[in-house]
Amino acid sequence: MAESQRASQELGINVGQTQLQPGQSARRGVRDSEVNYSGPSVGSQILDGILGAGQQIAGKWFEHNVQQEVLRGERARMAGEAEEAVDSNVLAKPFVKGGWRKQDYRIAQADFSLKMQRFIANKGREMTPEEFRKYLSQEATHVLDSTEGMNPNDALQALAQQQKAEEQLFGMQAKAYMDWSIDQAARGFRTQGNSILAKAVQAQATGDELSRQLSLEEAGLFYTNIMTSEDIPLEVRDKVGMQFLAASLDMNQRGIYEGLRDAGFLDSMSFDDRRALNGLYEKSKAQTRAKESMATLRADADFQQRVANGAITDLAEVEAYSRGMVEEGRWSDAQAISFMTKAMTGLGNAQRMQGIMAALEAGDINALHTLGTNVTEALEQWDKMQAANGSSLTDRLVQGTQLGLRLGTFPKTYGESVGSAVRMIQAAKEGEANPELVNTLNSIFEQVASAQEINPSAGNVMLSGIPEAEQGAVAWALKQMKMGIAPAQALREFSANAEVVKQMDEFEKGQNTKAFKDNLGKQVNDKFVNNIFGRAWNMLTGESDLSNNEAVLSMYRRATIDEANWLASDRKHAGLLTSDTGREALLEIAAANVRNRTIQVGEGRNLKEGDLFSRRDSAPLILPRGTTAEQLFGTNDTETIGTVLAEQHKPHVEGLLGYKSVVAFEYDRTSGSLLAVEYDENGVALDRTRVDPQAVGKEVLKRNADKLNAMRGAEYGANVKVSGTDIRMNGGNSAGMLKQDVFNWRKELAQFEAYRGEAYKDADGYSVGLGHYLGSGNAGAGTTVTPEQAAQWFAEDTDRALDQGVRLADELGVTNNASILGLAGMAFQMGEGRARQFRNTFQAIKDRNKEAFEAGVRNSKWYTQTPDRAEAFIKRMAPHFDTPSQIGVDWYSAATAE
């Protein structure tokens, strides 16, 4: 009985107490299965027998017990509460409306129905309807046995209920059998389809395009086979076909879907199915793009890193990669040129790297420009080189800071490292900060402090490279260091002060902000501007090299005040507004941000005239906050932008009475106009000229492309037009000279010599090609030469001349590359022996007597015969006669040495 009660409870039926409520039971019938069993049920057969054989006694039993049974039936009816709900459930109905006397029958019938439903869901679905009938007949025996002892009326109703229950069970089994049979038929299709998809995926993964194409063709035939098969019903064909296409898209085998779609095999598909498949198709494409994009990004990052590290030196590979990035729309022309330039000038170019290292250590900005780089790029390459040589991060940061501040630069890569150290020290509890980290930061700050004693802008230079989030802390620490407080302690105090400020009310914060803004005009004076944006170039007077024109100073003042006001309004800087030291630090941050947005237009001091103490021959273009050079000019090469602008609008214009007017630049973000404004010596605007920034940007890109082509030619060779003939040449040499310099020198030399395919009379005999000497007298007369042979002889002759030039330079104390090449050119033209006959000229070179040198050359027979070449020699030798300080002032070392 316990098992029967458990089974009944699983059906949701409690004997003697129904839980059905109106509307809870949904009507179900045999019709749901769409398959009806027409054979006789066991219950109907027994019912027919009882109706025929027991007709006489049935009436008596009914007459005797009618009142009692009606009462029982009424009670049951009342307990049901909802007849419609009860009628819809043939299993619950006996418990509610029949008024059965025997509880055992009701439980037995419920157990029977539950058991048969479970059986149908498992093994029963594999039986034919006839096999199931036999099984059901056996299982129904104990249910019919439980009707024994009932009065005829109860028995009749019980058997009728059993008949309905069996009819429902037969319908359920017939539908389950049909589904199972169809599934068995479709299983073969599914197995074959999965095999085809697996082969397609494997072929795609291994890159076997032939196998993949065969798999796609097989998949198309398979789909058409499904849709025309007589082994499965039409609706099942559609279902299996849909499943196959969905699976193919899920596995990113879109070629199957595309082929069938394009061939028209999907035209008869329903709109809903087509819409569903199209959604899966688009999803598959998006997934593939995401995977390919991620893989491409990883591959790109790896390739670019290898190029940066000098591991890839094949320019053809780099060029093909860059061209592909442009064609795919992932890079602009400017980005491609920049990448190729970095490849040409990266760590893989050992000779060039040696030149960069030497220029950095000498503080020679001009030499860096000759090498085609700027201070920031050079410092970053220096850092990579030091890292490759095993230098620690601490040593690299400290030495790099010294080199950078010496040249007025603090790269953002250095700033990020400092910012990271600041965050870690601030996060550590007192006494728990990493000692090495603390020492590193102390050393860096000491370098800055030493530089600030000589040049007040050094600290601001550093701040311009620090991440925005750490600028406040670093500016505060720099100020505190002047008062003897260690950087780590100052950083912790800054954090503590920030916590205190958080507790301040808004009124107090507002008062601090107002006080700071009200005092800005007094603080941002000319002295502040000169100290921050200039450099202490005149060691005698202490003045900076910044232009003293009122218009230029006013630009810096306005930009700094505007930036300071903006920073003061940001609540994260509230901690700096609570003290004089903090306010000074905030002002330094403002100036650093302005520095970052300033493009210097011009070449700096007037080195050509040898004026060491002149102010800077340049003017600023201060971009508004939020505007970048990339947005305005289409390139971030601010150095070349400044050069181009200076050529188009000279920073200084000589006046009729001897004074100089200044040309500065103003950009109005609202109107998008860039103006070159000429100011007189009092800062009054004289003229305004509109500048086309896009045209400037195009010129910058052209120059960078030309520079790249020249570098490519120096490294790998290029055709150079000489007298209308292409002569192949490069910068390779055995003297150890920079290839770029040698390439340019050879191009210049070739134009002087000119190309002649037939031997021509020379001073001592005959020459051919590009000045190749054939011998004295008539030796070589009538000789002809091809451009290829002429190029080969020219490379050999110039290489020999370079060795001679280096030898002469060593004897004469010449170290400048341009001047060494000047001596090599002299040796190429007349030979080393004849060159040495210029004894007085060589002595003037040795004595660095520029006037005597120039006089000696211009008064020579050589000058009379080939004046252009002699003048070129004078020009190339000019850097040798400049003092070392004029080539690259190492103000930092000179000042600290004092």
Swiss-Prot record:
Sequence segments annotated as region (Disordered): 1-35
Any Gene Ontology CC annotation: virion component
Enzyme class, broadest EC rank: hydrolase
UniProt keyword annotation of Hydrolase present: yes
Catalytic activity as recorded in UniProt: Hydrolysis of (1->4)-beta-linkages between N-acetylmuramic acid and N-acetyl-D-glucosamine residues in a peptidoglycan and between N-acetyl-D-glucosamine residues in chitodextrins
Gene name, Swiss-Prot/TrEMBL: gp36
Protein's name in the database: Peptidoglycan hydrolase gp36
Job of this protein: Component of the cylindrical core that assembles on the inner surface of the capsid during procapsid formation. Plays a role in ejection of the bacteriophage DNA into the host cell at the initiation of infection. Functions as an exolysin that catalyzes the cleavage of the host peptidoglycans.
Principal place of residence: virion
Compartments it resides in: Virion
Ranges of biased composition (kind: Polar residues): 15-24
Temperature dependence: The enzyme is highly thermoresistant, but not thermostable.
Domain of life, per lineage: Viruses
